[in-house]
A protein has these predicted regions:
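Extracytoplasmic gate region of multi-pass secondary transporters
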Residues: 51-106, 162, 166, 194-198
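Juxtamembrane intracellular "pre-TM" segments in multi-pass secondary transporters
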Residues: 12-56
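Intracellular juxtamembrane helix-capping segments at the cytosolic ends
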Residues: 160-174
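A membrane-interface helix-boundary motif in multi-pass transporters
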Residues: 119-122, 202-221
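C-terminal ends and interior cores of transmembrane alpha-helices
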Residues: 129-142
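Cytoplasmic membrane-interface "Motif A"-like loop-to-helix N-cap segments
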Residues: 113-128
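C-terminal membrane-cytosol helix-exit motif in multi-pass small-molecule transporters
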Residues: 1-26, 227-232
Length: 249
């Protein structure tokens, strides 16, 4: 990349990508130009670090990764030791947890565009309620069918806020800052989210029992819903600001 790659288009003498692609999509955050004189660090500090909306949407990913890795990492051991599943039964529940994500991610973007007018967070909050209920069922049930179905629901629904938060991140910042915003979200999700879902869950489960680990996951559900709600308020605020600016223009 260092030999063949370059900077942004205008660093190479080309017009901005919005002009090249003739993108007609209306952005929430509109700038007069792409601030061609700003370095990557300046973009990060001015458009990412200071934007509370970017932090909220990044922590959506933190909490969803906490839930996903908490279930994914500890599902085999939990089902074998606590629920008394055989290895084949455990493998079935594990496979359903993973494969159930495919239809939900395919439909999530279409549903938000069609029925929620491009609003990403309402559907995310709805699916997170389902995730919380499914975790409780997965935690308390004992028969194979119920536990497997609950694991499938968690796997199906948890990927919806993960996917939609990635879309929302791009929409919350100017086009030239989308890469930095996505990078922050990815960094936090792995440093905090996956670490909490694996290591912290394990420590709590070992010291205080499996229930402590599941309380951590339910805390993550509540925290994620809160961040989705605050992100949604931020989107509505940006839309009002954009409408007001259009009237005065």
């Amino acid at each position: 990349f260092s030999l063949c790659g370059g900077g942004r288009t205008y660093n190479e003498g080309l017009p901005p990508m919005s002009e090249i692609l003739q993108n007609d999509h209306e952005e929430l955050v509109v700038t007069k130009n792409e601030n061609i004189n700003l370095s990557t660090w300046q973009i990060f500090t001015q458009y990412i670090v200071k934007d509370i909306n970017v932090w909220f949407v990044s922590f959506i990913d933190v909490f969803t990764y906490m839930i996903r890795f908490g279930v994914l990492t500890w599902l085999p051991l939990y089902l074998l030791e606590t629920k008394g599943f055989t290895k084949k039964e455990m493998a079935l529940a594990f496979a359903i947890f993973e494969w159930a994500a495919i239809p939900s991610t395919l439909l999530a973007g279409y549903v938000t565009d069609t029925y929620f007018k491009g609003k990403r967070m309402p559907l995310s909050m709805m699916t997170l309620v389902g995730v919380g209920l499914a975790i409780i069922v997965y935690w308390s049930a004992s028969d194979l069918t119920t536990v497997t179905a609950a694991a499938g629901v968690v796997g199906c629904l948890i990927y919806v806020p993960m996917f939609l938060s990635s879309l929302q991140t791009i929409e919350l910042v100017p086009a030239f800052a989308a890469g930095s915003a996505t990078g922050l979200r990815g960094l936090l999700s792995y440093l905090l989210g996956s670490a909490s879902g694996t290591a912290l869950f394990g420590v709590l489960a070992e010291r205080y029992g499996w229930s402590a680990g599941f309380y951590l996951l339910l805390f993550a559900v509540v925290g994620c819903i809160f961040c989705c709600f605050m992100t949604h308020l931020g989107v509505l605020r940006l839309e009002r600001q954009k409408a007001a600016a259009a009237k005065t223009a």
